[in-house]
Amino acid sequence: MPNLLEKTRKITSILQRSVDSLDAELPYNAMASRLADIIDCNACIINGGGTLLGYAMKYKTNNDRVEEFFEAKQFPDSYVKAASRVYDTEANLPVENELTIFPIESKNTYPDGLTTIAPIYGGGMRLGSLIIWRNDKKFLDEDLILVEISSTVVGIQLLNLQTENLEETIRKQTAVNMAINTLSYSEMKAVAAILGELDGNEGRLTASVIADRIGITRSVIVNALRKLESAGIIESRSLGMKGTYLKVINEGIFDKLKEF
């Protein structure tokens, strides 16, 4: 049976994972699953707004309402507000407590259900909450030590993810600005007309038709598309007589065109 040191090492090894390996839809499912296995419980991670970032159900609660929260990836506002008032780990909360993960209709089914909630901090900010629960087994001091370590590890990963997202946003904005600065007025006009033809972020267009409609030459459109593609703003593929297939991969171009 793993001792406390071995369990701690398993938790801290999570930090060795790259942010790029996180799933976009539920980025912390794997992390919640590992914590659930190590601490022997169910676990979920929510951000400050109550959005579910990841969860692991090692032991089924047999409650449709709780599972609906997970499917919707959003916790009720009342629970989120109550959780935000937890500044230190609250352990072994009974089913009567407002912070229990067990809804009122399951109190008779799981009368001994216990919930532990730990705040997640990072960079001096409250980033979310780590919630773990068991149907009938108390969390001991060793478990709570692991919870404290886990919340710190999750906080570091959340900060890493936020930093990565911010850097990616800045990179995309910079790419758009640089691309726009290379366009002439006519090319900018062409880009606005082209993207206006798309169905969402992608679609088929015919350059000659657009050129005739806005009163520019086809070569202006071709040059504009080439500049955007070289900047990583769009992807294009010739469809021969049917025109050109276009896909926008940097959506920041749409915001920039609103200023045009």
Swiss-Prot record:
Keywords: Cytoplasm, DNA-binding, Repressor, Transcription, Transcription regulation. GO terms for molecular function: DNA binding; DNA-binding transcription factor activity; GTP binding. One of its GO terms (biological process) is negative regulation of DNA-templated transcription. One of its GO terms (cellular component) is cytoplasm. It is found in: Cytoplasm. Residues 207-226 bind DNA. Residues 1-159 are annotated as: GAF domain. SUPFAM superfamilies: Winged helix' DNA-binding domain. InterPro entries: ArsR-like_HTH (IPR011991), CodY (IPR014154), GAF-like_dom_sf (IPR029016), GTP_trans_reg_CodY_C (IPR013198), Transc_reg_CodY_N (IPR010312), WH-like_DNA-bd_sf (IPR036388), WH_DNA-bd_sf (IPR036390). Its main location: cytoplasm. CDD domains: HTH_ARSR. Pfam families: CodY, HTH_CodY. Belongs to the CodY family. DNA-binding global transcriptional regulator which is involved in the adaptive response to starvation and acts by directly or indirectly controlling the expression of numerous genes in response to nutrient availability. During rapid exponential growth, CodY is highly active and represses genes whose products allow adaptation to nutrient depletion. This is Global transcriptional regulator CodY. It comes from Streptococcus uberis (strain ATCC BAA-854 / 0140J). The gene is codY.
